[in-house]
Amino acid sequence: MGTPKPRILPWLVSQLDLGQLEGVAWVNKSRTRFRIPWKHGLRQDAQQEDFGIFQAWAEATGAYVPGRDKPDLPTWKRNFRSALNRKEGLRLAEDRSKDPHDPHKIYEFVNSGVGDFSQPDTSPDTNGGGSTSDTQEDILDELLGNMVLAPLPDPGPPSLAVAPEPCPQPLRSPSLDNPTPFPNLGPSENPLKRLLVPGEEWEFEVTAFYRGRQVFQQTISCPEGLRLVGSEVGDRTLPGWPVTLPDPGMSLTDRGVMSYVRHVLSCLGGGLALWRAGQWLWAQRLGHCHTYWAVSEELLPNSGHGPDGEVPKDKEGGVFDLGPFIVDLITFTEGSGRSPRYALWFCVGESWPQDQPWTKRLVMVKVVPTCLRALVEMARVGGASSLENTVDLHISNSHPLSLTSDQYKAYLQDLVEGMDFQGPGES
């Protein structure tokens, strides 16, 4: 017979009295209120000590045995939170988890004194019929409490060093006519984690504009990403699938504008490379054309403001982080934020159109990761939790999925808790 699982409240009181876990402490003399560190895993300054209470509970319940099991900080945190939320007589008094300097939560005993929990009690910890908070966080816990989440392989640092194998061009999206039912995915697999798996090919929709006129659109999928070039005859040893922008003579009539556009295209040289590594999209300029970029709306670039940056030459630069996008998407699904932006706009060969209409620029290119568009569309049509919708991730080895709104939100939360928050200059 195995060791009985301890009850969360007596165990927690004993940890508070010991005072050995970083940031876990009583906050009043009557010992009715206590604080728990609640730093999000996305924060750059997150340390293992910030998750000490969650690991201790995982060890106490037998969910984690050091040396045998792999550490899983997001799951520890989720299970601890779920155990607290089920407890009658305990309430969340203050939620300071968004505090930039000291994120934490303060809980309070309301129906019984601490003395009731002062002695260790190893009777089974059952769910009981206690009141449960109706926050989205608790709904996610109920959905994810019994899941076994496999860690992702280390994607390694971004690199442009290896020439790609030939990629089929273009690749069509899988049909939505026969979506794969959700149960076929397996009980422990979060399908959204495929977005981060090394080797999974993101699909990019590339649209080019000459003086505001759309002249080109193509959907590309290649493990090494893509490379915008201005000539069919390019350096095939460079990485990324070459996407050749069309000659302006095919769509423009003004000879002067045609001449300027051709000059810009000729200066692209090796091209503008864009690829994914981990949760980041990276870009690098391989030619002479200065290129500015911004993350904006699909319909038009954010021309009323300055660019987000300039694509660096001869080194990679981060242009999109999936982590904040997913955080904003979760907020959007909860109705408390705007739809996150995901379209990358590039102004090639000229300064960013900050004070002028973007249609005056010679060459503007929009790149949309179609998987991100699909995630936003799923959030928009989610509606009631009982409503099933279909989402197509538009990445390799994936098929359309039928998910309820609650399943979708739960998978988003699980995805973001497993991410790292890295600056674009870090690997």
UniProtKB/Swiss-Prot annotation:
Monomer. Homodimer; phosphorylation-induced. Interacts (when phosphorylated) with CREBBP. Interacts with MAVS (via phosphorylated pLxIS motif). Interacts with TICAM1 (via phosphorylated pLxIS motif). Interacts with STING1 (via phosphorylated pLxIS motif). Interacts with IKBKE and TBK1. Interacts with TICAM2. Interacts with RBCK1. Interacts with HERC5. Interacts with DDX3X (phosphorylated at 'Ser-102'); the interaction allows the phosphorylation and activation of IRF3 by IKBKE. Interacts with TRIM21 and ULK1, in the presence of TRIM21; this interaction leads to IRF3 degradation by autophagy. Keywords: Acetylation, Activator, Antiviral defense, Cytoplasm, Disease variant, Disulfide bond, DNA-binding, Host-virus interaction, Immunity, Innate immunity, Isopeptide bond, Mitochondrion, Nucleus, Phosphoprotein, Transcription, Transcription regulation, Ubl conjugation. The record marks D121, T122, D125, T126 as: Cleavage. It comes from Homo sapiens. It is found in: Cytoplasm; Nucleus; Mitochondrion. Expressed constitutively in a variety of tissues. GO terms for molecular function: DNA binding; DNA-binding transcription activator activity; DNA-binding transcription activator activity, RNA polymerase II-specific; DNA-binding transcription factor activity; DNA-binding transcription factor activity, RNA polymerase II-specific; DNA-binding transcription repressor activity, RNA polymerase II-specific; identical protein binding; promoter-specific chromatin binding. Pfam families: IRF, IRF-3. One of its GO terms (biological process) is innate immune response. This is Interferon regulatory factor 3. Changing L401V: No effect on IFNB induction upon Sendai virus infection. There is a cross-link at K193, K360, K366 (Glycyl lysine isopeptide (Lys-Gly) (interchain with G-Cter in ISG15)). Disulfide bonds join C267-C289. Residues 91-107 have a biased composition (Basic and acidic residues). It is linked to Encephalopathy, acute, infection-induced, 7, herpes-specific: A rare complication of human herpesvirus 1 (HHV-1) infection, occurring in only a small minority of HHV-1 infected individuals. It is characterized by hemorrhagic necrosis of parts of the temporal and frontal lobes. Onset is over several days and involves fever, headache, seizures, stupor, and often coma, frequently with a fatal outcome. Belongs to the IRF family. Residues 141-427 are annotated as: Mediates interaction with ZDHHC11. The modification Phosphothreonine is found at T3, T75, T180, T237, T244, T253, T404. Changing K193R: Highly diminished ISGylation. The keyword Phosphoprotein applies. The modification N6-acetyllysine is found at K366. The modification Diphosphoserine is found at S386. The keyword Metal-binding does not apply. In the absence of viral infection, maintained as a monomer in an autoinhibited state. Phosphorylation by TBK1 and IKBKE disrupts this autoinhibition leading to the liberation of the DNA-binding and dimerization activities and its nuclear localization where it can activate type I IFN and ISG genes. Phosphorylation and activation follow the following steps: innate adapter proteins, such as MAVS, STING1 or TICAM1, are first activated by viral RNA, cytosolic DNA and bacterial lipopolysaccharide (LPS), respectively, leading to activation of the kinases TBK1 and IKBKE. (Microbial infection) Activated upon coronavirus SARS-CoV-2 infection. InterPro entries: Interferon_reg_fac_CS, Interferon_reg_fact_DNA-bd_dom, Interferon_reg_factor-3, SMAD-like_dom_sf, SMAD_FHA_dom_sf, WH-like_DNA-bd_sf, WH_DNA-bd_sf. Residues 5-111 bind DNA.
